[in-house]
């Protein structure tokens, strides 16, 4: 029921254009400074891409918290969920903070009483989904869009909508991420099923859509021309187009960009609650949200 609630929410926020929220309030609270700041170890489980962790997360967090050691475990959302599920069964949760892209999972954890209620002073600036008691809050927004290779397709010839992907002219030439591995793909599937019914995916199957392990595999095969167009995260396309001048282009679907709020939460089992809270404060602050934007995602 909780997943169904979030999937319906995702369908409700199918937008005709990309909404870019502000990067925190002007009076956001600084999480810490070099004097009297949080100390100790904090573990973060996240689905943020490894290169973004290395180039954006680690240096910014290290600068904000010089006396705190933050360790990152990265994996696809469903891989992280599988890891946590095993840890819960063993009564040995290994992380303090969670940042993955399956919003419904946070509701499951909250129902199980596993999340720490913490109302960050910056929570008031979050305009996307959040829990009023602070058990979780959106920290970044991911957009699922259609992408194509502009060396292979002219803009006027590219798919203009999700429904366009069912056109027989794209048979065997389209792809999507595996929703069993990708949290954003999972939410996208729910949103499209809610909008068009499950027969939409029967049509995609008949059109020989290929299911790849993740967004990175899709971007690479778009570049080689193996696929003409694909469902993919906007951030993948923007990063390649702007940093490597690759010929990938975004087609914002006329029947709605799928906007996916991705939350942050603290486990009650944390061994360093003050450090974990400081990290949440930072992510929801202006500095943290600017770091999100540097990672080609959208702020909350």
Regions found by a protein language model. Name each.
Residues 37-38, 43-71, 79-82, 146, ...:
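Short, polar/charged alpha-helical segment
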Residues 47-55, 73, 77-78, 93-227:
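Extracytoplasmic ligand-binding site segments that recognize negatively charged/polar headgroups
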Residues 53, 142, 172-180, 203-204, 211-212, 246-268, 282-300:
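Periplasmic-binding protein-like
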Residues 57, 200-203, 262, 271-283, ...:
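Short amphipathic alpha-helical coupling segments at ligand-binding clamshell hinges
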Residues 104-108, 228-247:
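A ligand-binding cleft/hinge motif common to bilobed small-molecule-binding domains
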Residues 147-152, 190, 260-273, 291-292:
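A bilobed periplasmic-binding-protein/Venus flytrap-type ligand-binding module shared by bacterial periplasmic
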